Amino acid sequence: MSELSHTVYFHGLPGSGGELALFDDVPYGKLAHMFVPIRDSSRTQSDCTAYMDSITRQIEARFPEGPIHLIGFSLGAFVAIHIATLLKNRVERIDLVSAAAPLEMGDFLKEMAGRIVFQAAQSSPFLFSLMVKWQSWAARLFPNMLFKAIFANTAGQDRELAATPAFQKGMAKILNDSLGRNAHIYQSEIAFYVSGWATSLAKVKQPVTLWQGQADNWTPPAMADALQQALPHLCSRRDLMGLSHYSTLRHFLGEYANSAGEKA
């Protein structure tokens, strides 16, 4: 991570920039410099290209010059890949953490905890819309209930995380921000994600590092396998035994914070 590079973080879905402050053992002060673009689909409607262009313009306005380091967590990897192809040689490197691969690249859904959401988005936009409305209602009025529903089948070290009050409180706020107040963004971006984007991977010319928890049942290891085969400039893959989705993010952010501390 170059001292001169600007860092851009793409959160998961549901998610927000609050992910950077989720973990008590990762000092947020070492991460606070990261730029988290606003992912607002209200003006781009169902146009994925316009949506990605709007995010790219935010980054260019924030960082007119200098190399850029992209970090994509979970479904944020989908956005990071697209932005990398638009920013081109401005991007110095990419870290994909618990990355969601294109669904058309494998039989992943049967291994994914959130399969019902993606199946609805693929097969029935109407049903998906109803599902998002229910999630939005629950996030605003009963965030703890929604948290328990989403984290009912956690695996690996995510089980320990999900049992901690600090993580529960942080995720409840994230769910309210993402689903309660910005459900339209969540709905639009998942619709973009399931529409097929595997061809974008071959356009990524920057070095990529994959961070994959081997116990992840949100974005299973098979997704990292597919990305490894498709990305032309994969420079490293970090397989983390016993870690699942958010525990892999915690591990990555901890390493990033330690590296930032060494450079300070």
Can you annotate each of these PLM segments?
Residues 218, 237-254:
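Catalytic histidine-centered segment of alpha/beta-hydrolase-like enzymes
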Residues 114, 135-199:
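Alpha/beta-hydrolase
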Residues 17-18, 217-223:
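Conserved alpha/beta-hydrolase "acid-adjacent" motif
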Residues 94-135:
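Flexible "cap/lid" loop of the alpha/beta hydrolase fold
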Residues 204, 210-212, 216:
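Short beta-strand/loop motif that positions the catalytic acidic residue
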Residues 2-45:
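Conserved HGGG/HGGXW glycine-rich cap/lid loop of the alpha/beta-hydrolase fold
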Residues 71-76, 80:
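Gly/Ala-rich beta-loop-alpha elbow adjacent to hydrolase catalytic centers
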Residues 35-68:
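Active-site loop/oxyanion-hole signature of alpha/beta-hydrolase fold enzymes
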